[in-house]
């Protein structure tokens, strides 16, 4: 059968089942009907062949079985399926919810934004009308009051005029559409910050709720309510578990209590407990965020007061960023308020799927079943086998993980949501919490925990056998597919909320072990820096010395002839001792010159007559 034809047949079957239920006064959503169709087809006791095309008789049988199960209001299994479908359709993660919430707000404001950005106003009345639309847009986007309240409109208009006078509309109209949208968002943030600051100063704040105070009151109340509901659900689960353990050991009693659907009731309350824990985790995150934002809000307001004080005018570059930060914080408060409201309503609506417990198991019936039974909590069961551990020497092929040898031990995705797979398989559906400290079995890239060491050893002998038993049990009780997170084995029944968690199945364990390494004493040659100083004061002393030298001047004495001199370099040969010797010795003597001048002293006559007399002896006379 082609895919399109098969889809058409399935839609017709779902529509027919819905009409049959409506005829009997039971209004059922198409999602629940579709899930029930898949659950009935999966159940091997109904005799449907997944590989064979459905004939008319098969369709009639399928419709009849689905209608019968959907009209059985005393079946805890039906309530569990409805609870799972409701939670899947109404719960999203914190990040996805806030993203969708902001997207819805943007889509609602799109009409008002387009009226402002697409206008071509020119006349005075048109400009005034445009300004009023901007005020309405600011109020709608900020969520601080109704745009129909005259007091709120006046306050918002006054705040807007202080940063965006009406005279600037002409400039605003000349901007591009994207710039207009950006400026509208920026004006909204600034006006919101101004109104919040005025409210804190006691000068305004009309229509602004005290969100921090509301959240500080709502979060503890919601947390207390969920804690109380969680405690009731856990106590009920502990009682059902104790009764089922008693029944398992008594075959005659098990036959008598088979119509009471004890295990289906246990699955219902366990699923409710898991959903409450999910919601409680989100609310705790909200409480942490609100506590942090409250401190930031007080700090921003105090900074703004210190900046403004009693000044008549403050630069926009100083106050506008603080106004925008205030508005952003207030938007986060609004997000947390909406999220808390949604989670609170979700918790309240989950209680509607617990009605069968009072019908099937009133207090008198429970007291009779609990006669002589010791009710144990999950923690008590874990503590009973706390000292037991799997011995690695007993297993050569299988891999076991322990908290001492695995760094991300608490982050591993345990199969069957942490319940003991062996106990569930051998008792035909009893849910007992696994104890990770005994050891986590890693088998085919999946991780399993057990409530005792004996259960771990038995499961390890033939894991595939017990895994198949659990899968067959899940086919009979379709609510176990989501309760035990068996989506990979039944891909057609993966809920939308679980699709984004597929990556969690691929978390690898980070094992730890003791290793030793040895290196050479000195791989590299030593490099000693003589100028290195470890003393801080010595470094300061050198810094001061350099600073002082920087301010000093060098003096020199130069003359007119020496100021052009420069350094020169010359090269000489080194000195050495040398001796010479001649063949003979000789000497000469020259006569000493003796020349005299007579008559220099003068005489009787006035004229001096000098006579030069050479008395030098001849050379040959010496």
Curated annotation (Swiss-Prot):
Write the record's keywords in alphabetical order, separated by commas: Cell projection, Cilium, Cilium biogenesis/degradation, Cytoplasm, Cytoskeleton
Listed GO CC annotations: axoneme; ciliary basal body; motile cilium; radial spoke
- In which domain of life is the source organism classified? Eukaryota
Q: Does the keyword Ligase apply?
A: no
- InterPro entries found in the cross-reference section: FAP206 (IPR021897)
Q: List all membrane-crossing ranges.
A: none
Which organism is the protein's source? Rattus norvegicus (Rat)
Q: Which Pfam families match?
A: FAP206
Q: What is this protein called?
A: Cilia- and flagella-associated protein 206
Family label: Belongs to the CFAP206 family.
What does the UniProt record say this protein does? Essential for sperm motility and is involved in the regulation of the beating frequency of motile cilia on the epithelial cells of the respiratory tract. Required for the establishment of radial spokes in sperm flagella.
Q: Name one GO biological process term.
A: regulation of flagellated sperm motility
The places in or outside the cell where this protein is found are:
Cytoplasm, Cytoskeleton, Cilium axoneme; Cytoplasm, Cytoskeleton, Cilium basal body
């Amino acid at each position: 059968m082609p895919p399109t034809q098969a889809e058409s047949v399935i839609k017709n079957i779902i529509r027919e089942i819905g009409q049959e239920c409506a005829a009997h006064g039971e209004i059922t959503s198409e999602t629940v009907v579709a899930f029930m169709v898949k659950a009935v087809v999966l159940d091997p006791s109904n005799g449907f062949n997944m590989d064979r095309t459905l004939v008319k008789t098969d369709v009639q049988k399928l419709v009849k079985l689905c209608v019968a199960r959907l009209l059985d209001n005393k079946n805890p299994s039906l309530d569990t399926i409805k609870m799972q479908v409701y939670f899947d359709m109404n719960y999203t993660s914190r990040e996805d919810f806030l993203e969708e919430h902001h997207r819805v707000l943007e889509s609602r404001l799109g009409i008002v934004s387009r009226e402002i950005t697409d206008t071509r106003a020119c006349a005075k009345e048109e400009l005034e009308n445009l300004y009023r639309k901007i005020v309405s847009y600011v109020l709608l986007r900020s969520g601080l009051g109704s745009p129909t309240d005259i007091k709120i409109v006046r306050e918002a208009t006054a705040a807007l005029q202080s940063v965006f006078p009406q005279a600037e509309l002409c400039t605003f109209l000349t901007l591009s559409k994207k710039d207009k949208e950006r400026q509208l968002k920026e004006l909204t943030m600034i006006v919101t910050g101004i109104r919040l600051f005025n409210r804190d100063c006691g000068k305004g704040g009309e229509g602004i709720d005290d969100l921090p105070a509301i959240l500080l009151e709502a979060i503890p109340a919601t947390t207390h309510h969920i804690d109380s509901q969680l405690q009731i659900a856990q106590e009920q689960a502990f009682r059902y578990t104790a009764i089922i353990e008693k029944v398992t050991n008594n075959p005659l009693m098990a036959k008598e209590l088979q119509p009471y659907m004890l295990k289906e009731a246990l699955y219902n309350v366990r699923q409710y407990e898991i959903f409450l824990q999910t919601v409680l985790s989100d609310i705790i995150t909200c409480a942490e965020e609100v506590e942090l934002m409250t401190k930031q809000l007080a700090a921003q307001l105090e900074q703004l007061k210190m900046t403004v004080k009693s000044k008549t005018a403050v630069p926009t570059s100083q106050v506008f960023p603080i106004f925008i930060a205030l508005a952003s914080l207030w938007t986060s408060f609004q997000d947390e308020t909406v999220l808390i409201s949604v989670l609170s309503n979700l918790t309240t609506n989950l209680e509607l799927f617990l009605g069968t417990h009072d019908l099937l198991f009133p207090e008198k019936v429970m007291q009779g079943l609990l006669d002589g039974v010791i009710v144990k909590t999950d923690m008590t069961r874990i503590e009973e086998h706390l000292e037991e551990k799997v011995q690695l020497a007993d297993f050569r092929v299988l891999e076991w993980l322990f908290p001492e040898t695995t760094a991300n031990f608490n982050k591993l995705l345990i199969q069957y949501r942490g319940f003991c797979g062996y106990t569930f398989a051998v008792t035909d559906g009893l849910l007992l919490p696994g104890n990770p400290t005994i050891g986590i079995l890693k088998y085919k890239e999946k991780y399993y925990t057990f409530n005792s060491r004996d259960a771990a050893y038995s499961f390890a002998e033939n894991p595939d056998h017990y895994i198949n038993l659990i899968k067959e049990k899940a086919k009979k009780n379709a609510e176990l597919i989501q309760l035990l997170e068996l989506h990979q084995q039944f891909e057609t029944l993966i809920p939308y909320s679980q699709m984004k968690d597929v990556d969690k199945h691929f978390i690898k364990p980070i094992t730890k072990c003791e290793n030793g390494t040895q290196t050479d004493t000195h791989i590299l040659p030593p490099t000693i820096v003589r100028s290195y100083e470890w003393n801080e004061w010595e470094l300061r002393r050198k810094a001061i010395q350099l600073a002082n030298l920087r301010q000093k001047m060098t003096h020199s004495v130069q003359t007119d002839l020496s100021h052009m001199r420069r350094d020169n370099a010359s090269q000489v040969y080194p000195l050495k001792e040398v001796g010479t010797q001649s063949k003979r010795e000789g000497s000469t003597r020259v006569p000493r010159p003796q020349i005299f001048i007579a008559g220099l002293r003068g005489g009787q006559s006035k004229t001096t007559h000098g006579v030069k007399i050479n008395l030098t002896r001849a050379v040959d006379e010496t």
